[in-house]
Swiss-Prot record:
Lineage, uppermost ranks: Bacteria, Pseudomonadati, Pseudomonadota, Alphaproteobacteria, Hyphomicrobiales
Gene name linked to the record: hisB
SUPFAM superfamilies: Ribosomal protein S5 domain 2-like
GO biological process, one term: L-histidine biosynthetic process
Enzyme category, top tier: lyase
Annotated protein name in UniProt: Imidazoleglycerol-phosphate dehydratase
Amino acid sequence: MAASNPRQAEISRKTNETDISVTVDLDGEGRSDISTGVGFFDHMLDQLSRHSLIDMKVSALGDLHIDDHHTVEDCGIAIGQAIAKALGDRRGITRYASLDLAMDEALTRAAVDVSGRPFLVWQVTFPSPKIGSFDTELVREFFQALAQNAGITLHVTNLYGANAHHIAETCFKAVARVLRAALSPDPRQLNAIPSTKGTLNG
């Protein structure tokens, strides 16, 4: 499937607030080249790439003199659009996945349906409003933008945790791992769209 039909895409998105370019290879090795100007966010996107095995290049110039919000949200939009473009008609994918992921004291559950129907259920509370200078509320904003633009139904629940960095990192890693599983080809139905409707485009 991957060899004859490369699942790769490039997206450029420019507004008055941000200028973003993204390339993805869904059948990669988890290589990343991330530069958003937001250090903690770069670290999280590296984790997303590494653990999903999606090769990802993200370059962003944003209005960081205001805050990080536009850059983080717009990266979610562009990455989501790139994933959707690379998936095409979503033929042959596994579609569903769920996972509990631990990091020290934190445990987070993620579940995904690559359905073509965008939706986010977010049950994550952070013990502090910031991780360094990064606003923790932006973690949700990123995943909201990602889900809406990738056309996926995504549930993320932090079951417990005390360290805000660990909670955020388990969210990114758990989502990465369920994307890795759900986007993988299903060897038993490589040429089929995994839906009784015959479409995964909404």
